[in-house]
Amino acid sequence: MNFQNLANQMKKMQREMEKKLAEFEEKEYQYEYKKLIKTTLKGNLRIVKLEINKDLIDPEDPDTLQDMVTEAINEALGDLEKKRDELSNSITPPIKFPGF
C-alpha cells in the first residue's frame, strides 16, 4: 500500500467517524434507574428529560432524592461513554504498518 492510498483511506475513515459521531450525539437515549427515575440524554451528554416518581419526593428528606438523581445520571452518562467508545473503536480498526 502506498502512502497516498493510506492517506486517502485515513481521510475516508475520519469523515465516516465524524458522521457517525455526529449522528450519535444527536440521538436520544433513555435510561431508567430502579423504576423510580427516568432520564433521556442525547449522545452529546445533554439531559433532554428527567422524570422522578412522585413517591420519591419527600420534602423532609431531600438528600435521598438528590443522591438517587445523581446516581441515575452518572449511570446514564457512564453507559453513553461506553457506547461512544464502542462506536469509535468499531469505525477505526487498528492500522498495521509493515515492519512494526
Swiss-Prot record:
Q: Which Pfam families match?
A: YbaB_DNA_bd
Q: Which GO terms describe its molecular function?
A: DNA binding
Q: Where does the record place it?
A: Cytoplasm, Nucleoid
Write down the InterPro entries for this protein, in alphabetical order. Answer: YbaB-like_sf, YbaB/EbfC
Q: Kindly indicate whether the keyword Calcium belongs to this entry.
A: no
> What is the protein's major site of localization?
cytoplasm
Q: Which domain of life is it from?
A: Bacteria
State any GO CC term: bacterial nucleoid
What task does this protein carry out?
Binds to DNA and alters its conformation. May be involved in regulation of gene expression, nucleoid organization and DNA protection.
Q: What binding partners and quaternary form does the record give?
A: Homodimer.
Q: What is this protein called?
A: Nucleoid-associated protein MYCGA6000
